[in-house]
Amino acid sequence: MVDREQLVQKARLAEQAERYDDMAAAMKAVTELNEPLSNEERNLLSVAYKNVVGARRSSWRVISSIEQKTSADGNEKKIEMVRAYREKIEKELETVCQDVLSLLDNFLIKNCSETQYESKVFYLKMKGDYYRYLAEVATGEKRATVVESSEKAYSEAHEISKEHMQPTHPIRLGLALNYSVFYYEIQNAPEQACHLAKTAFDDAIAELDTLNEDSYKDSTLIMQLLRDNLTLWTSDQQDDDGGEGNN
């Protein structure tokens, strides 16, 4: 029998050492024990995989940019090598995303009770995020499928959060942040992105007195990110130019 506490301890240790693959493996094993995760365990899982997938997303962007420049040069051998390397990174990224999505579907979302709204929103947001990361690298029909899955998860989380969570709750705010980025970057729908981000920001401002002391820092940081994105996106619309949001 695997000792759950030992696995969690290992994940904490791996985080301090910035060994995120080890951290993710430990938290995957904890999740597969098929018991609900505590808030700390949930966050450890999220941080681990965010860093693991983040490294691949960053590499993919760099190589994609090099690929575009190389295509212009017309050096066939180099073009082929860069393309093969991009595809290798894509496969790694897809494997990580599928790992997370299967943990969410087979254990985490499945095991949420009807009244565990916070956990349900957290995990559905995560589901939306990892389908969004797949959408960043997918093309054609495959892209259409993952975009639809991402939208569905975000939308369900959004409805639950509006009904059961304070507008200042960091998980509700974080969901609005990522959902609006999905609209802007993946759906190419700047008006929807701005509307969602502005509504979330305004609703939180209107209820600042409900800010929980424990989550004050998290909530205000996400509100700042929402505002930064709004500033960027509205200026992009005025310039009629594309831009990138955070997250």
From Swiss-Prot:
GO MF: phosphorylation-dependent protein binding; protein kinase C binding; protein sequestering activity
Site entry: Interaction with phosphoserine on interacting protein: R57, R132
KW Cytoplasm (keyword) present: yes
InterPro entries: 14-3-3, 14-3-3_CS, 14-3-3_dom_sf, 14-3-3_domain
Compartment(s) where it occurs, according to its Swiss-Prot or TrEMBL record: Cytoplasm
Keyword presence, Cytoplasm: yes
Assigned protein family: Belongs to the 14-3-3 family.
Main location: cytoplasm
Record protein name field: 14-3-3 protein gamma-A
Organism of origin: Xenopus laevis (African clawed frog)
GO terms, biological process: protein localization; signal transduction
Function: Adapter protein implicated in the regulation of a large spectrum of both general and specialized signaling pathways. Binds to a large number of partners, usually by recognition of a phosphoserine or phosphothreonine motif. Binding generally results in the modulation of the activity of the binding partner.
Subunit composition and interactions: Homodimer, and heterodimer with other family members.
Swiss-Prot/TrEMBL keywords: Cytoplasm
GO cellular component: cytoplasm
